[in-house]
Amino acid sequence: MPGNSFGKLFRVTTFGESHGPAVGVVIDGVPAGLPLTVEDIKFELEFRRPGRLYVSGRREKDEPEILSGIFNNRTTGSPIAVIVRNTDVISSFYEEIRYKPRPGHADLPFIMKYGYENWDYRGGGRASARETVGRVIAGAVAKKLLMLADTWIAGHLRSLGPEELNEEVTFEEVLCSKYSPVRASKKVLEEKYEALIKKATQEGDSYGGIAEVITKNPPIGLGEPVFDKMKAELAKAIMSIPAVTGFEYGLGFMVSKMKGSEANDEIIRKDNKIGWKYNYAGGILGGLTNGEDLIVRCAFKPTSSIRKPQKTIDLRNLEETYISVIGRHDPAVAIRGVTVVESMVALTLVDHAMRAGVIPLVKLTEEQGNIVQQRWERYVRSCKPMEESQL
């Protein structure tokens, strides 16, 4: 099964299955001298961890174990290997789907490709979103390394089901949405999202949503014409996330309804520098980052595992039947998905920053390491929850 690695210079390989002993990641290409601790990784992992309010009831602690690549809280330049053990596995929930593939899931395509006898039906196996633990671990490393360029990445849930954000949001609000149980950047939206989640849970159903990720101060010129354009690289990275069904940046599909005179973003002087008036392009022109905020959005489909009965085929007799999926599943996978999107944006940007020479390939100087650590600590402090009146 190829296709488990991502990136060229900053290369990430994830491994493990939902109900196997552990999931994990190997990160190759991290320069030596980057300050990095288990706590740095846990900070990001916490926001995709199950067992919290409004997400899957699977109670995993998600404690990362660093196996290699770090010594005295600094990267050594060798591959970084990290695992997270699966400690709350109940495979008995999945005995029924052993013979009844779930609608909306990868069950049947995996059986068709790899063979029924080779299919790990427990929790979805390799197709499970549990795989994204490795992405978030690598994303934490990438986010910290990007602090060398003072590049910050944060996301929020722009819509959930029929409810959506219809007003401007500040980057500070997006940062603080990490502590919203539904990743809302506004208090009024948080209440609407929570009501939807409660309704879906009661009905045995689920909702989809749109995640938006904003990158502040991205290095200029990232991306390589023609086939490695930044928009193409981000699209591939984000579309590889389980349950993601669509991608856009800037104005996205809205530009298809506009005239050129409306969609073109005028070039102006901003703070004694050349810039764009409205950033309609979302920070990418000609496939290159232009220094404006990098704004991407993606659509998550509703969680496929729902209690409502749905038609399927019993593989033992090839007769039509019904399945009601039991177990512990997210009523809206988009909530935890926001952190995964952040991670894939970070992995894409850090790889291109290294290719462009913005980040050193071999090692960080002691001064660079200290700068990174100071900025990282400021980032962590900035993610503290706002007072209710500020949300």
Curated annotation (Swiss-Prot):
Which EC class, in a word? lyase
What are the binding positions for FMN in this chain?
R126, A127, S128, G286, K301, P302, T303, S304, S305, R328
What cofactors does the UniProt entry give for this protein?
FMNH2
How are cofactors bound according to the entry's free-text note?
A: Reduced FMN (FMNH(2)).
Q: Which UniProt keywords apply?
A: Amino-acid biosynthesis, Aromatic amino acid biosynthesis, FAD, Flavoprotein, FMN, Lyase, NADP
Q: Does the keyword Lyase apply?
A: yes
Kindly give the InterPro entries that the UniProt entry links to this protein: Chorismate_synth (IPR000453), Chorismate_synth_AroC_sf (IPR035904), Chorismate_synthase_CS (IPR020541)
Which ranges form a coiled coil?
A: none
Instruction: Note the PROSITE patterns from the entry.
Output: CHORISMATE_SYNTHASE_1, CHORISMATE_SYNTHASE_2, CHORISMATE_SYNTHASE_3
What Gene Ontology terms for biological process does this UniProt record contain?
Answer: amino acid biosynthetic process; aromatic amino acid family biosynthetic process; chorismate biosynthetic process
EC nos = 4.2.3.5
Q: Name one Pfam family in it.
A: Chorismate_synt
Q: In which pathway does it act?
A: Metabolic intermediate biosynthesis; chorismate biosynthesis; chorismate from D-erythrose 4-phosphate and phosphoenolpyruvate: step 7/7
Q: Which PANTHER family match?
A: CHORISMATE SYNTHASE
Q: What does this protein do?
A: This reaction introduces a second double bond into the aromatic ring system.
Q: Which family does it belong to?
A: Belongs to the chorismate synthase family.
This protein is called Chorismate synthase
Please state the gene responsible for encoding this protein: aroC
